[in-house]
């Protein structure tokens, strides 16, 4: 104790009031340092330091909203892990950016992020086939549902396999397969169809589910297709279809446009439009398996 008092006397701090002032000043300096040091992390604004992408969620599996460039500025509104939720103040568009592409002190992930579809088994069920032609159009093209469900499924199969998924098809050619024999197990089951009504006015796409464990997949695919597709959106709905009822795995029935509607038929026939829909489905599956 005497040594402490001697040191205080030497420094001219023997007076208790002076000591309190010094301690308060030191604590203020420490607080100010901590505040300034955390400012870059908690700042309301961030700057992009290298070209990157604005995504719909905090993961590289989420779809890209648009490209961002070095020097762009955003308002920071949230953070999950190393991903920053931002808002474009000019357009009010919200999205997520990997923190290491910003001026924030966030170290990049050096490990390659695993593709969420890697190792997953996806069952594709092209509706109808053979003697069961499904719906048909009333235009000069006389398009048949069974043909375009198969085209879509085959194109989607190639895209999914490139992503590392294993794909099982309930049919690969123009043959009839009973509903009972379409019950194939996998991590996800997609039954692909085109809708039709007597009236040519009905249009758009619908995602159907039946069991409760199928709804999350249906809602996710509905959101990603709505984001990218040109078809009007009729939402995600519960329906008692046999292909959904007889399987217990996450399954959906996709009605990708009304073949009885001339505008929808044009999009169903167009390969580029199908590819956009197919990529939206892949994006949705990635998000679903990343959750």
Swiss-Prot record:
Record region (Disordered): 118-140
Coiled-coil features, chain-numbered ranges: none
One GO BP annotation of this record: cell wall organization
Keyword Cell membrane: no
UniProt signal peptide: 1-40
SH3b domain span: 41-105
Listed Pfam families: Amidase_3, SH3_3
Localization in the cell: Secreted
CDD domains, per database record: MurNAc-LAA
Keywords carried by this UniProt record: Cell wall biogenesis/degradation, Hydrolase, Secreted, Signal
EC id: 3.5.1.-
InterPro entries membership: LytH, MurNAc-LAA_cat, N-acetylmuramoyl_amidase_3, SH3-like_bac-type
GO CC entries: extracellular region; outer membrane-bounded periplasmic space
All copies of domain MurNAc-LAA, residue ranges: 122-286
Disulfide-bond pairs as recorded: none
GO MF annotation, one: N-acetylmuramoyl-L-alanine amidase activity
The keyword Secreted appears for this protein: yes
Protein family: Belongs to the N-acetylmuramoyl-L-alanine amidase 3 family.
Function in brief: Probably involved in cell-wall metabolism. May have autolysin activity.
Protein name, as recorded: Probable cell wall amidase LytH
